Design a protein with these regions (language model features):
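Conserved helicase/translocase motor-coupling segment
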Residues: 1-34
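A cross-kingdom feature that marks ATP-driven nucleic-acid transaction machinery
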Residues: 27-208
Length: 208
């Protein structure tokens, strides 16, 4: 929970050991995924069909495979019963990072639909680069390409008011490579076929 509650959700190996290297823990991450305890999301440097070809194994996010378990662990030091905690979360009576739960829920939904999890990140530290991060990349049939597969970027938003700067930059840069873009948010369905952009209620994550 501590890793996911940060704004930058990329897993930091230094939280395990200041001298940690991915080759040391690679097998441990594989075991967590294979045991269905965690859903591992890898960075892809190129948003093209065949995301595994540009996968960066040293850059990853580690989501809990069960969002309910994540909530339980996040409040494990709370004296209230699980029922009281869930009720408080639903009512908004507990101050917490909703983005942590929302993004974990979407990761769980995409994984359940058979997607391997990838994200895109550009630090913006190099000259001429713009900073951007896309929460998830999935491969889906694209109507405007005769149903052939294209990469669809997915942004996850938990507040009702939000911006889409990263998604806008990503679409402008990779316009010819990607298909329909999606924003999952706590609002109603908005479908713009001309702009190839869909805003979906969070519960519709299972449709992707």
């Amino acid at each position: 929970p501590g890793q996911l509650s940060r704004h930058e959700k990329r897993f930091k190996l230094s939280s395990l050991d200041k001298n940690a290297r991915m080759r040391t823990y690679e097998e441990a991450f594989f075991w967590l995924a294979d045991a269905r305890i965690a859903n591992i999301c890898y960075a892809a440097s190129e948003p093209s069909v065949g995301l595994s070809l540009s996968m960066e194994q040293t850059a990853l996010k580690c989501y809990m495979a069960d969002t309910g378990l994540l909530v339980t662990l996040a409040f494990s030091d709370n004296n209230d019963t699980d029922e009281d905690v869930y009720r408080a979360v639903l009512r908004g009576d507990i101050g917490l990072n909703e983005g942590m739960l929302t993004e974990n829920y979407v990761a769980q939904s995409l994984k359940a639909n058979g997607h391997r999890l990838f994200f895109y990140s550009q630090s913006g530290k190099k000259e001429g680069e713009e900073r951007m991060e896309i929460d998830f990349l999935v491969t889906r049939p694209y109507v405007n390409a005769a149903g052939k597969p294209r990469i669809s970027p997915i942004e996850v938003k938990s507040p009702r008011r939000y911006g889409t700067i990263s998604l806008d930059r990503f679409r402008a840069r990779f316009n010819k490579k990607i298909g329909m873009a999606y924003v999952l948010h706590p609002k109603q369905l908005e479908w713009d076929a001309e702009a190839q952009l869909a805003h979906l209620p969070l519960y519709m994550a299972f449709c992707l």
